Amino acid sequence: MEPCRSLALLTSSLGLVSLLVAVSTNFWFAARGPGFSSHSGLWPSKDQVSVAGYIHVTQSFCILAVLWGLISTAFLVMSCIPSLSAPGRGPIVSTFMGFAGALSLIVAMTVYTIERWNQPANPQVQSFFSWSFYLGWVSTLLFLCTGGLSLGAHCTTHRPDYEAV
């Protein structure tokens, strides 16, 4: 197995796992004040009636990125097993899906970052982004690496010549 394909499979798997952890945890934003601390994520608790629009946008694009990541990983796995894939098709599909996942995450993370950054601050409360948020950005970088490495795997794949057909 080529090094680009192996590394693409590794980055795709790591990106997918880190995104699933980021999306499923409630430590995107944290706040500390005198005598209390709080944290929140993408999924509202039962006592919250309305959810801001930017949260819905972030949820939707993160779910899309998970789907793109699943497809990318699946095609990379299938490309490693010759009986399951058409020759040379797995890495190119994984390239498109990796970049689609990265683009979806860039939209989701940018919307969340801008909206949270522009919220009014209370001088007695220290608010900051937490580890789930940063894991979302790490997933974005991993999906970009997946796309690039899959493209490298596609470009270096040996294709039969015309005479072999």
From Swiss-Prot:
Membrane spanning stretches: 9-29, 61-81, 92-112, 133-153
Biological process, per Gene Ontology: CD4-positive, alpha-beta T cell activation; defense response to protozoan; granzyme-mediated programmed cell death signaling pathway; inflammatory response; killing of cells of another organism; natural killer cell degranulation; natural killer cell mediated cytotoxicity; natural killer cell mediated cytotoxicity directed against tumor cell target
Stored InterPro entries: PMP-22/EMP/MP20-like (IPR050579), PMP22/EMP/MP20/Claudin (IPR004031)
Keyword Membrane: yes
Compartments where found: Cell membrane; Cytolytic granule membrane
Coiled-coil regions, chain positions: none
Keyword annotations of the record: Cell membrane, Cytolysis, Inflammatory response, Lysosome, Membrane, Transmembrane, Transmembrane helix
Described purpose of this protein according to its UniProt entry: Regulates cytotoxic granule exocytosis in effector lymphocytes, thus acting as a critical mediator of inflammation in a broad range of infectious and non-infectious diseases. Essential for cytotoxic degranulation of natural killer (NK) cells and CD8(+) T-cells and for the activation of CD4(+) T-cells following infection. Plays a critical role in CD8(+) T-cell and NK cell-mediated cytolysis of target cells and contributes to the cytolytic activity via the perforin/granzyme pathway by enhancing exocytosis of LAMP1-carrying lytic granules.
Family: Belongs to the PMP-22/EMP/MP20 family.
Protein name: Protein NKG7
Organism for this UniProt entry: Bos taurus
